[in-house]
């Protein structure tokens, strides 16, 4: 299965009538493996900052998580595994695997829990596959 297929079928899938706004699988070095057509153009520094928070949880809390120029308030995640951010009625979930970051961006009517489930389910699967 190609990385683009994972994005199209596993991340941009329908859940209770809702879809993520955008999604991507990005290498820990910031290289794009696959992304939805509307995934925001991000800066390498933004991915570096996200990776730093996985290495040292809490580093993003004071400044927020920035992705594609959008600032998200960091909310409770799982240290070293998941970072969650919120902005107004939407937000972002980032799941770290051995080699990649799985990123899902959502907006209402999708709920944070639905986004978390989609992103973390794929992340867990890839970890089980040694990715």
UniProtKB/Swiss-Prot annotation:
Recorded GO MF terms: actin monomer binding
Keyword Cytoplasm attributed: yes
PROSITE patterns in alphabetical order: PROFILIN
Pfam families to which the protein is assigned, alphabetical: Profilin (PF00235)
Protein name according to UniProt: Profilin-1
GO CC annotations, alphabetized: cell cortex; cytoskeleton
Organism (species): Hevea brasiliensis (Para rubber tree)
Function as written in the Swiss-Prot or TrEMBL entry: Binds to actin and affects the structure of the cytoskeleton. At high concentrations, profilin prevents the polymerization of actin, whereas it enhances it at low concentrations. By binding to PIP2, it inhibits the formation of IP3 and DG.
Complex and partners: Occurs in many kinds of cells as a complex with monomeric actin in a 1:1 ratio.
Domain of life: Eukaryota
Predominant cellular place of this UniProt entry's protein: cytoplasm
Keyword field: Actin-binding, Allergen, Cytoplasm, Cytoskeleton
Alphabetized InterPro entries for the sequence: PFN (IPR048278), PFN_euk (IPR005455), PFN_sf (IPR036140), Profilin_CS (IPR027310)
Family: Belongs to the profilin family.
Protein location: Cytoplasm, Cytoskeleton
CDD domains the record matches: PROF
